[in-house]
Structures are given as C-alpha cells and as structure tokens.
C-alpha cells in the first residue's frame, strides 16, 4: 500500500517490480498520511467507530497507524496520550482502538446476521456475536469536543439485549469479552490517575496490564433455547463466543 504523497509514476514502477518479482498483492487504495492530532483517537469511542466502519466499509480507516510516534508530534500536552492515530501508544500501551481489531479478529467469514450495532458469525465449532455501541455519532469521525465535555460523555449510550439462540444441540460454553469506557480502556484509566504528563515505570506497567478486555466464562446446559441477557454502557463493544461443551 502506498502513501498518498507518492506520485502515480513511482507507484506504477514499484508495483510492476513487486508483481514481477514477488508473490505479493499491492493494495490499490492509498494510505492517508496525516499529522493531524485528535484526542478522540485515544478514546473508547474508536471501538464502535472502527467496528462499524470495518463491517460496513462506510468510511476509510487508512488514517490509523500501528503506533504513536512521540518524536514526530508537535504541540502535545503530555507524553502518554497525544491524540495520534496509532492503535498502540508510544509506550506500548494498547488503546481501545487496538481491541476493536482484536474483537473483529475473532469473527469468522460466515456471516449469519448483520445490522447496525451487531454482527453474528459462525465457524465449524462456534458462534461469535459482536455487539457494539451504535448511534449517529459513529457515521463520521467525531472530534473530541463533540463527544466529551470536561472528561464526561456528552451523550450517554446504554442498551440492553435479550438474545435467544435456537438449534443449539449441546451444552454450551459462553465466553464474553468486554471493552468500554469503564472496562479495559487505557485512556480512561489514565484519566482516573489524574492525566499525568509522564508515567513512572510502575504506573506504565499497571496501565499496560490493566488495559485488557474483561473476560467471563459461563456454562449453559442443553436446552431448546439459549437465552443471553446482556447490556452495553457507554462507547464500547462486547463479544460473545458460544462453543459446544465437550
């Protein structure tokens, strides 16, 4: 994949060389190189935004990068979360955006059901149900000020679900992964610490270990209908894996 800054002549020349000499595929869509900072990149808002736009391919996500680079950032107010579009910060701490891709990676290609706010997939040995916060805010990338005000969410999202799964032919193991503004969000934990400009070694280790989805395990005996009651609060996502119990 090429940067949008590279001329078409150079792209064509390099593409021909790659295709002639290597068994590789060149992505035709350009990678957007942007130095713009937006604090929203660090927040849990990115979870539903990335999931929705990955599933429905509404908006390009090519502005995202693997890591923040502190040395290249200007006009920053701290060294922890600088509003850069990396899914991992400069210290190796995973942002909520990282876990959007983590949860998506657990889906299979066989889509059973799909709509705004959820997707259900099926593989040979398990179902995956991915729920995510859905409202008009995720249709286009918002600014931090549009979503948050003085550290609080302007528009609180809350939704309850009652899921009925039929044709389950055995007892079931239920594994749930949850990430949102209150659970697993490194940015929100950092806010709770008082938004320090720098982290000590101990603080860095704590934040690194704490920034992980909450995982729950449950067991359900075989029944004609498997009912799962759950909810989403704030910007976030929840993945429910259903596996036959052996």
Model features per residue range: what roles?
Residues 1-35, 59-65:
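Aromatic- and acid-rich polysaccharide-binding/catalytic face
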Residues 2, 24, 82, 101, ...:
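Hydrophobic transmembrane signal anchors and adjacent membrane-proximal interface regions, especially
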Residues 17-23, 53-61, 104-110, 164-168, ...:
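A structural motif corresponding to the C-terminal end of an alpha-helix
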Residues 34-147, 185:
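Aromatic/acidic polysaccharide-binding cleft in carbohydrate-active enzymes
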Residues 132-246:
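C-terminal beta-sandwich/jelly-roll accessory domains of carbohydrate-active enzymes
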């Amino acid at each position: 994949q090429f940067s949008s800054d590279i001329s078409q002549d150079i792209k064509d020349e390099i593409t021909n060389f790659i295709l002639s000499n290597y068994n590789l595929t060149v992505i035709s869509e350009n990678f957007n190189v942007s130095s713009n900072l937006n604090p929203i990149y660090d927040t849990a808002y990115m979870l539903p935004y990335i999931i929705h736009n990955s599933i429905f391919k509404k908006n390009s996500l090519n502005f995202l990068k693997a890591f923040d680079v502190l040395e290249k950032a200007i006009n920053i107010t701290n060294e922890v979360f600088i509003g850069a579009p990396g899914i991992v910060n400069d210290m190796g701490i995973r942002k909520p955006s990282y876990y959007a891709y983590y949860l998506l990676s657990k889906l299979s290609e066989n889509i059973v059901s799909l709509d705004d706010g959820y997707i259900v997939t099926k593989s040979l040995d398990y179902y995956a149900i991915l729920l995510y916060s859905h409202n008009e805010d995720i249709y286009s990338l918002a600014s931090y000020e549009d979503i948050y005000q003085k550290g609080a969410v302007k528009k609180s999202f809350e939704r309850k679900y009652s899921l009925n799964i039929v044709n389950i032919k055995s007892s079931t193991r239920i594994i749930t992964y949850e990430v949102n503004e209150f659970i697993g969000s490194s940015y929100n934990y950092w806010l709770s610490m008082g938004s320090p400009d720098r982290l000590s070694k101990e603080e860095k280790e704590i934040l690194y270990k704490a920034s992980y989805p909450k995982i729950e395990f449950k067991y359900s005996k075989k029944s004609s209908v498997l009912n799962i009651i759950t909810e989403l609060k704030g910007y976030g996502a929840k993945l429910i894996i259903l596996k036959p119990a052996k």
